[in-house]
């Protein structure tokens, strides 16, 4: 019986080691393809060690949108600054994992002059973003990253790491190559109030604003600011524009931004009602390439220089 147990243990350990070796191999295979920030939704595939950046973006899709469709190269040119975008779209990342990405960024010897945190109200209230299990699916398996995350206070940690490992064994990951559409040209013709109402319900999980979740998110944001400032990084917070103007929870988010600006010595801007031309949007709260360029030139550039 003891011999059987020993054999089972040896087999189990050997299987785990084999899986991890394959995961490491597929990660290396994808990592060596030299991705640009505009060519992947991954952060680690574009983050290098001991690098310096002028700007680092954090947030959800409203942040990541500054890099999609080759917008990354456009705003680097407009601002004349080196940029890393660690914002995560697709409903996969909440404030806590954004904090972890920043911790890992600094732990790898990287530096940033400024962090631009796109403070979308749904990001602050969401109960689903913090427990998304697919947050790290498109991140290569790196032992320092995984080890640090194992020691990081996180919701749904085990499921997130398991999903990360499993995804490395799929054709989708192995065939992940650098790709970006050259420009985002889709545009709206007009504001559709019914669509906006449905979108607000979806963003807030068909419920009222969750103040307990907001308080948790606000605490994480303050930890993020403290971490950045401890590394000599300035922080700029802004609420992004939307064709409909203000999200549900806007005033609460705005008051938080104004409060931390006073308490933490950071900059805060409310840009929610700055872009009302439908031609600048591909949906009611995401700017297309024309919108990203216009917003960066008219509003973002003046506050970052």
Stretch-by-stretch model annotation:
Residues 1-16:
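N-terminal Sec-pathway targeting helices
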Residues 119, 128, 132-231:
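Secreted/periplasmic serine-hydrolase-like ester/acetyl group-modifying domain
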Residues 14, 18-84, 89, 95-99:
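Membrane/wall-proximal cationic-aromatic binding patches
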Residues 251-304:
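C-terminal regions of proteins
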Residues 62-149:
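Membrane-embedded segments
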Residues 64-66, 91-96, 212-217, 243-252:
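Acidic-and-aromatic substrate-binding clefts and catalytic sites of carbohydrate-active enzymes
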Residues 54-55, 114, 236:
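Structural motif
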């Amino acid at each position: 019986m003891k011999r059987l147990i020993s054999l089972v243990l040896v087999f189990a350990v050997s299987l785990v080691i084999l899986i991890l070796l394959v995961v490491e191999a597929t990660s290396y295979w994808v990592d060596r393809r030299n991705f640009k920030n505009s060519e992947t939704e991954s952060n680690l595939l574009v983050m290098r060690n001991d690098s310096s950046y002028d700007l680092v973006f954090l947030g959800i899709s409203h942040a990541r949108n500054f890099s999609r469709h080759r917008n990354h190269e456009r705003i680097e040119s407009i601002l004349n600054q080196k940029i890393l975008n660690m914002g995560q779209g697709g409903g996969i990342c909440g404030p806590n994992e954004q904090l972890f990405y920043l911790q890992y960024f600094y732990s790898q010897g990287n530096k940033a002059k400024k962090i631009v945190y796109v403070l979308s109200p749904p990001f602050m209230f969401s109960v689903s973003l913090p427990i998304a299990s697919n947050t790290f699916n498109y991140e290569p398996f790196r032992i320092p990253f995984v080890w640090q995350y194992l020691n990081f206070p996180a919701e749904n940690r085990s499921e997130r790491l398991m999903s990360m490992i499993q995804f490395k064994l799929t054709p989708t990951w192995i065939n992940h190559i650098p790709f970006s559409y050259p420009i985002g040209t889709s545009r709206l013709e007009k504001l559709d109030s019914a669509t906006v109402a449905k979108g607000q319900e979806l963003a807030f999980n068909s419920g009222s604003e969750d103040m307990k979740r907001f308080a948790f998110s606000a605490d994480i944001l303050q930890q993020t600011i403290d971490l950045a400032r401890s590394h000599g990084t300035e922080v700029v917070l802004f609420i992004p524009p939307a064709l409909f103007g203000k999200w549900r929870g806007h005033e609460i988010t705005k008051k938080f931004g104004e409060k931390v600006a006073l308490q933490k010595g950071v900059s805060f801007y409310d840009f929610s009602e700055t872009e009302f031309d439908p031609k600048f949007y591909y949906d009611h709260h995401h700017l297309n390439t024309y919108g990203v360029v216009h917003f960066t030139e008219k509003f973002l550039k003046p506050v970052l220089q």
